[in-house]
């Protein structure tokens, strides 16, 4: 498996480079060229990317060796499943808080809170106390919720309200973030492998390595973003005198009222539009399975001795390849529809889990087939996320999108928690641990969920058979990744 992992990484890295070069030749849009030529936009974009990419780097560093760390501390698989459930449950609980905190504390201050909470989360990994590790997972859930909302909220506010750049340029920045994000994920796996295995520092090393990145992120937010916020105070907020005349309790009440109204409006939008509900069902089914996969890939492969950091980088390279294939497939020469690519992604994911039910038979494991199945699943993820993002942009109203997506994430995390709890119960009941059939049964269940997701997609396109919103027309949509 050692040689197989390195060979897979080399092949996938070469494939990603070739696909990216081809995609850039075919998909450079006019809006991208205009934005690149604007020096003020470039300066603001770099200001945002410095801090945000450091935050993403710190997050990715913790991916390859989390399960390995808990096993290093001699916890059972059932105990580790509970730790993962605590992290997912905290994401559910803190998701509303993550949307409200920027209004209460301010966007920049909430980004600083993210850096602090995630740093403490990393420090807890030094402890072998189970309850301290649970606390770390709870803080990790809070940090993940803040990472996915607060940084982007600061950027969009500055882009639209302060600098008054065209809204069409926002996808240019987030397209760049997406491209960098995959590269950071691949690099994080390599660096984590270097420190944990080549230098012999153990599975806790990547978590400690993330702390300086979080500190650097906090420094950029304090210093450079602070200067930006001062500029906003001088030039950007013409309503400041009026706002200052109001008392603080009323402002806080208004923020709460806006938050709850957005939640109710999002739920009403979800229940009133069948297209939105079906798309939410697809997202809940597909992405909850991904959370289960994140838990299971390490115990499936680790007993056979692969370098986990290299395997992680290979998985992320497969996702990057899928994302680039999406850009190519929807570009002018091919014009494939995102809905068709979404169906393809779900079929690939189903086939991957179907393979895994046979490659993880107790007593007869086939780790190379399992690795291939995991790589196919990540390729499917690369196709899935931009396709779903396109459909969300077409069927969910812009003003309600954040609230609707928050409601999407609720069943997503609940399904993942139930899956991990079911695995915990089966492992605990059989006493077989990784040698039992719980993992195989879980993969079979995931395959069933993929079939349900496929039925939901078919229903979505049956409902919207003649709906132009579900189709890509004209020039390729800007910001698709």
Swiss-Prot record:
Q: Which InterPro entries match?
A: MFS_trans_sf (IPR036259), MOT2/MFSD5 (IPR008509)
Q: Where are the transmembrane segments?
A: 1-21, 47-67, 80-100, 131-151, 180-200, 201-221, 276-296, 306-326, 341-361, 371-391, 403-423, 443-463
Localization = Cell membrane
Q: Does the keyword Cytoplasm apply?
A: no
UniProt keyword terms in alphabetical order = Cell membrane, Ion transport, Membrane, Transmembrane, Transmembrane helix, Transport
Molecular-function annotations in GO: molybdate ion transmembrane transporter activity
* GO BP term, pick one: monoatomic ion transport
Topology in membrane: Multi-pass membrane protein
The stretch of residues making up the signal peptide is none
Coiled-coil region list: none
PANTHER family on file:
MOLYBDATE-ANION TRANSPORTER, SAM (S-ADENOSYL METHIONINE) TRANSPORTER
Q: What is this protein called?
A: Molybdate-anion transporter
What organism does the record attribute this protein to?
Danio rerio (Zebrafish)
